[in-house]
Amino acid sequence: GGGARSGDDVVAKYCNACHGTGLLNAPKVGDSAAWKTRADAKGGLDGLLAQSLSGLNAMPPKGTCADCSDDELKAAIGKMSGL
């Protein structure tokens, strides 16, 4: 591997298909209010990470990035949410 991918790289390759458009009620990239509501309900950024690891509704585990590390996913969530 080429080392850790940045949050931007992960978002662009794996997250944007749904989170870029709000497909299937996914919180949109940059919609900090929608992300904050979810983060507050789930225990912050770590809670959102835990949800992403297990999958949620239409989102598969790790949101299609099966080989992403927890740190890469957390960076991507941070980029999308602004949290």
Swiss-Prot record:
GO terms for molecular function: electron transfer activity; heme binding; iron ion binding. Homodimer. Disulfide bonds join 65-68. Heme c binds at residues 15, 18-19, 59. It is unreactive with cytochrome c reductase or oxidase. PROSITE patterns: CYTC. Belongs to the cytochrome c family. This is Cytochrome c5. Coiled coil: none annotated.
